[in-house]
Amino acid sequence: MVQLKQAVRNLSVDSHLSSSEIFNRVIKEVQEFLFRQGGFSAANWGDVLIDCINIWVTEHPNLFKLYHFLNHILILLQTKRKDELSSTEALAYVRDYIEFWEPVANKVTNNFIDAVDLNDASVLLHGDNVLIHQLFKKLADYGVKPNIYQTVTRPTMEGKNQAKILAGLGFDVSYIEDVTVGKFVSLIDVFISGADGIRKNHFINKAGTLMISLACERFKKPHYVLCDSRNIMNEAESSPELIRKLTAEPPKNADAMWAFPPNGVVPISYYYDTTPSNIIDKFVLEFGVFDPEQIEELDVSYPVSSLLDISY
């Protein structure tokens, strides 16, 4: 129990993780926690896991895929009596969830490759996204070597990790400051980003995505958004209170901007921003390539657990 609570605290203070890293860390911590329970029933560990899940949902808004996973764990805890649900059964449920969703990344990247020819292209990337890693791994395997411009992706600087990964795959990567995109946008053929959360008319992603997307619109450069259906907000089943909780972002610690500002100066930092869907070109998901206006037609509904704390 203590180890899981410590893992929650560690994740709270590790502010430079990408969305993919946060998602993978949470899944790992849940699996290890359930394994440590040694087959005992949820009567012994269920309340602790519920509390930690609600902390994760609160501390990591805008990550709709993470919420999708955590909500499914709560649904399991909600639908079975605690004295009838063993940690072994819950762990098997988590492994089944991982196995079910594992092929999705392959489908998304294949759909992009079928839709967009990157031979001799120049590509702009922002953030650090596992789908982007897998896409470029396939391109390397196929001998397709586009020229890459990778942003630093402030304030978390997570673009550095993606630049290292892509360079390790054999690509030439120009590592550029976010604010200098205007100098490079005329040189690119396509901007590729992920999306942490998609709603009917807009999507949430790393801060800077809106600025870059507006530049691409102005210079008539296509913007493709790679994600899977878990990133789409379950609008039909979610209360207004839950939607507000999942889309609210309080200002982050801004010490990296200015540790000791003078009186009258207030550094403000956010990790995410919101981009109108009508300024991008396509969403690429596991079941196809979609125009922005088609997103609200997709059925991504699933039950919402009553164990979720919707206060914020």
Question: PLM ranges: what are they?
Answer:
Residues M1-Y93:
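Long amphipathic alpha-helical segments
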Residues V13-H16, S122-L124, D128, R199-I204:
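Short, glycine-rich nucleotide/cofactor-binding loops
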Residues V123-H133, P155-T156:
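Gly/Ser/Thr-rich loops at beta-strand to alpha-helix junctions
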